[in-house]
Structure formats: structure tokens, C-alpha cells
């Protein structure tokens, strides 16, 4: 037998916020299709609603929801705009990935700004060189969905 736990108030609130965005996302779908990118306004609404911090640790201003709730949010957003739901899924999972890094790395990213957005590419072909004052990273990346919003 499989039992499901009750949703937290934060999870319920995030799901409600996602539902409230659906009409606005739907209204921009044609523009997103025409421009071949998610409108900046849509990403700002995701951010303003706290949805991009759904998987972010509470210690850094996130909601630390379970993956099931994260995917429920994504499914709701898809009712408004599939492209926005895709971007949400890609951008929204990065806080979960960063949460697996050492705490020092998390502090470096979220220490002063809990709203910092993260992007990455899953197929990097790069070279890292130590230079005076830090590192130089050069390489080629075919794409990184959502990177223009980070």
C-alpha cells in the first residue's frame, strides 16, 4: 500500500500561485512561439511567485518542496504554456542540484541574494585555466535552456 503525506502550506501556496499564472502564460503562448523563447515577463512572474525557489533549501530562502510537488507545479504551468513549463523545469531543478554541493558553494551563490537564478549545460566541452585573480573558462555549449534569464 502506498500512502502520500499531506502537503505543507508552502506547497499548497506554490501550487495556487502556479494556477493563478496560467491565464497570463496562456495569453503569451503565441508570442513565445513566434519569438522562439519564453517572454521575460513570464520568467519574472515565475520568480516573483517564488516558483523558481521551490526546490531551493529553506536555509537559503527556498521552500524545499518534494519533487512530486515540483512536478505538479510544472504540470500546472504547462496548462498555460508548454515552453514556460519546460523552462521552469530546467531552471527550477538547478537549486536542487546546487543543494548537493558543499555548503560553501551554496553560500557563494545564495549567501547575499536568495533570488539568484542558476543555469548550466549538461554537455560542456570546456577548458578551465587558472589565471591571476581566478579562473578563465572557455569552451562551446550548444544550448542551455533558460540561460538568457539567469
Where does each model-flagged region fall?
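Alpha-helical interface subdomain recognition
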Residues: 2-56, 62-72
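Glycine-rich flavin
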Residues: 40-48, 52-150
Amino acid at each position: 500500500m502506498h500512502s502520500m503525506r499531506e502537503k505543507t502550506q508552502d506547497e499548497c501556496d506554490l501550487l495556487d500561485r502556479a494556477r493563478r499564472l496560467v491565464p497570463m502564460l496562456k495569453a503569451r503562448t503565441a508570442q513565445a512561439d513566434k519569438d522562439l523563447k519564453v517572454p521575460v515577463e513570464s520568467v519574472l512572474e515565475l520568480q516573483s511567485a517564488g516558483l523558481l525557489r521551490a526546490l531551493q533549501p529553506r536555509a537559503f530562502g527556498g521552500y524545499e518542496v518534494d519533487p512530486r510537488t515540483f512536478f505538479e507545479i510544472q504540470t500546472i504551468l504547462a496548462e498555460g504554456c508548454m515552453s514556460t513549463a519546460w523552462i521552469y523545469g530546467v531552471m527550477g531543478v538547478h537549486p536542487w542540484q546546487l543543494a548537493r554541493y558543499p555548503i560553501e558553494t551554496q553560500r557563494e551563490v545564495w549567501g547575499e541574494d536568495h533570488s539568484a537564478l542558476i543555469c548550466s549545460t549538461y554537455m560542456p566541452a570546456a577548458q578551465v585555466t587558472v589565471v591571476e585573480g581566478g579562473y578563465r573558462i572557455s569552451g562551446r555549449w550548444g544550448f542551455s535552456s533558460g540561460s538568457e534569464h539567469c
